[in-house]
């Protein structure tokens, strides 16, 4: 039996690169092949809407997680990491395999002192880390050289 994949990413209604990537995957045959399900964690708008999306995503995630094998987390920087870190920690508690697909807009805040702890924890709990380019591999290896999981472009 093929593994089932929960995809944790921003909403379909949010503009941006992560949404575009997940929508593209959703149209591919691998989406059905691996029984993928999109957990929408964030939507642009007022604070109440953002909180609503996060809370409903956490509830949906907790209900579905026991029936899935892999959690594929799409993450940018800053608040995206704060949200997605929660999902990764829960997945680890359930002994799920975790893929972190890292696509931030810039490396500027990648390893700021206030931010680096959480991003490193997210990377370290992943079984596989996907990045957008060879340059990202270099930056991540400079900031987190002991990454235990595989790092792929």
Go through the PLM ranges and name each one.
Residues 1-43, 95:
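N-terminal subdomain of nucleotide-sugar transferases
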Residues 5, 36, 98, 129, ...:
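Hydrophobic/aromatic residues located in beta-strands of well-ordered beta-sheets
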Residues 66-71:
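Short acidic/histidine-rich motifs immediately flanking catalytic phosphotransfer sites
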Residues 87, 93-94, 112-128:
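Membrane-proximal helix-turn-helix segments that form the acceptor-binding/catalytic region
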Residues 124-153:
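Donor nucleotide-sugar binding/catalytic pocket of nucleotide-sugar-dependent glycosyltransferases
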């Amino acid at each position: 039996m093929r593994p089932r994949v929960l995809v944790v990413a921003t909403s379909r209604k949010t503009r941006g690169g992560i949404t575009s990537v997940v929508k593209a995957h959703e149209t591919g045959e691998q989406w059905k092949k691996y029984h993928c399900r999109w957990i929408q964690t964030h939507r642009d708008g007022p604070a109440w809407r953002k909180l609503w999306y996060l809370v409903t995503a956490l509830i949906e995630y907790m209900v579905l997680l026991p029936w899935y094998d892999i959690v594929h987390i799409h993450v940018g920087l800053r608040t995206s990491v704060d949200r997605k870190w929660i999902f990764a920690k829960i997945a680890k508690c359930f002994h799920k395999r975790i893929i972190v697909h890292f696509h931030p807009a810039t490396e500027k805040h990648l390893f700021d002192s206030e931010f680096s702890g959480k991003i490193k924890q997210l990377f370290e709990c992943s079984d596989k880390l996907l990045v957008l380019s060879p340059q990202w591999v270099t930056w991540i290896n400079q900031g987190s050289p002991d990454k235990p999981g595989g790092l792929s472009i």
